[in-house]
Design a protein with these regions (language model features):
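Extended, alpha-helix-rich binding/interface surfaces that flank or overlap catalytic cores
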Residues: 94
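Solvent-exposed interhelical
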Residues: 89
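Membrane-anchoring alpha-helices and their flanking helix-loop junctions
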Residues: 1-86, 98-170
């Protein structure tokens, strides 16, 4: 897949997957209406804004890595040709899923809506199951020893302190 097709496919997938999971569903659950919250909640709202903005930034970065480095999309129907291990993927294997969760939790804090925390827990469980039962076996089959080395070196859900450097990567 060339970069233009990968970029278009990634943009469509961005709207359909994280756009729905982190945008449409939270809106459907809350109408994006904030609860009347006490003054002491303000720091939590600020933390929510930070999580939401950081989540959006990480998502854009992760999608860009799939296009530029992987020559494909995050969508299982149009996967990458190359294993994506650069950028934030040097720290954690699943930055895209973590970013979506950060965006949902951020909205929960901004709006003061516990339903979004419960939703984030359900989404997290779905992500973990999808990664375990589909994504990791698929990547192992597609990229073999290279993926296994990456998987051993880079945690799935809690970032490393220092970036991983594959063997032979100056």
């Amino acid at each position: 897949m060339d970069r233009v097709r990968a970029a278009v496919g990634s943009a469509v997938f961005f709207a359909l997957a994280p756009g729905v999971v982190a945008g449409v569903v939270p809106w459907w659950l809350t109408g994006w209406r904030a609860r009347a919250l006490p003054a002491w909640w303000l720091p939590l709202r600020v933390a929510g804004v930070v999580l939401l903005v950081a989540g959006a930034g990480v998502l854009v970065h992760a999608f860009a890595r799939f296009v530029a480095e992987g020559l494909g999309t995050p969508a299982p129907v149009a996967p990458t040709r190359e294993l994506v291990v650069g950028g934030l993927y040097r720290y954690v294997r699943n930055p895209m899923y973590l970013a979506v969760l950060a965006a949902i939790v951020g909205q929960a804090l901004i709006l003061g809506r516990l339903v979004l925390l419960a939703y984030a827990a359900v989404v997290a469980a779905a992500f973990v199951a999808f990664v375990h039962w589909y994504e990791e076996p698929t990547l192992a089959e597609q990229f073999g020893a290279r993926y296994q080395a990456y998987r051993r070196a880079v945690p799935g859900w809690w970032p490393r302190r220092h970036p991983w450097r594959p063997a032979g990567d100056g």
